[in-house]
Amino acid sequence: MSQLIATKRVDLLAPYLALDQGSRVQAEYIWIDAEGGIRSKTMTLDKAPSSVADLKEWNFDGSSTNQAPADNSDVFLRPVAIFKDPFRGGANILVLCECYDNDGTPNKSNYRAHCKKVMDAAKDTEPWFGLEQEYTLFDADGQVFGWPKNGFPGPQGPYYCGVGAGKVFARDFIEAHYRACLYAGIKISGINAEVMPSQWEFQVGPCTGIEMGDHLWMARFLLLRIGEEWGITPSLHPKPLKGDWNGAGCHSNYSTKDMRTPGKGMAAIEDAIKKLEKKHLEHIAVYGEDNDLRLTGKHETASMTTFSAGVANRGASIRIPRHVGAQGYGYLEDRRPASNVDPYRVTAILVETTVLNN
């Protein structure tokens, strides 16, 4: 990978990362901007916090992130979750934040605030989630990583969960991300190479309620930061390449306590599916940008305009896994969300539709 343009010289940085920083801690404050991108900046703390409550509220220039006008540009960062920092190590931390305007209301980009209200209202039903984040890797030239220059690899077929040179690309990058997530405390549950070469997937969950969005956003942050070091750009576009190539989704596995209960689980799952069918277009509206390029009824997707459900059917809007159908309880998989979906929005609307009946 020496031909890539990396932004970090490990050999130069390592001696400085090894320096003693005493009791002081670097806290990387992380937030989501107006376009669904990720931003961050660093604060020095006198000592390691014992909880989120020990962290200071901070602010940033919202006019530079399209989150506020220039004449009233301060946007406030309220810490909501702490993770270990795999880049700096030691007691240094990553701090996920919500964005608030100066009048105390959630910023227009803050979908977490609404999601938290939804999850609090539905907490007795114990909503669990597991999200499957697909993404595509691009090199410094804007080419799909590992693909022939000015050409294409062989047709799809040997790449899904593939092993061997020419079938799998950037496995070292993928492994680095996996380990970084584990170190940080993110509930990453697995990885696999996807159908299109240089397309990968990681899974996060099971997570309860608001925790799902927090952990997926932090996993995305680590993916982008590690990409800086490799000179690789991970893309969450749901259809990064035209033609006979699979798109990228964020399949959303979801259950409530009733769905997981033997004897009545399948009835609860079927009831949820009926509710989801009635709200199909409302869900599509918040399931990610450019999803129409992906949900074509081809390449293991359902039609964007038609709702469908079935056991073990990867061409359906909602899939009931085979083992769930056999045992009669478990969870459902919503296959409609695009890879760039905001996890707070998808988890919130699933609960609103199936539990709160909104």
From Swiss-Prot:
Domain GS beta-grasp per the UniProt entry, residue ranges: 25-104
InterPro entries recorded: Gln_synt_N, Gln_synt_N_sf, Gln_synth/guanido_kin_cat_dom, Gln_synth_cat_dom, Gln_synth_gly_rich_site, Gln_synth_N_conserv_site, Glutamine_Synthetase
Keyword Hydrolase: no
One MF term in the entry's GO annotations: ATP binding
EC number(s) recorded for this UniProt protein: 6.3.1.2
GO CC entries: cytoplasm
Superkingdom in the source lineage: Eukaryota
Main location group: cytoplasm
GO BP of this protein: glutamine biosynthetic process
Sequence similarity: Belongs to the glutamine synthetase family.
UniProt protein name: Glutamine synthetase
Species this protein is from: Cryptococcus neoformans var. neoformans serotype D (strain JEC21 / ATCC MYA-565)
Annotated gene: GLN1
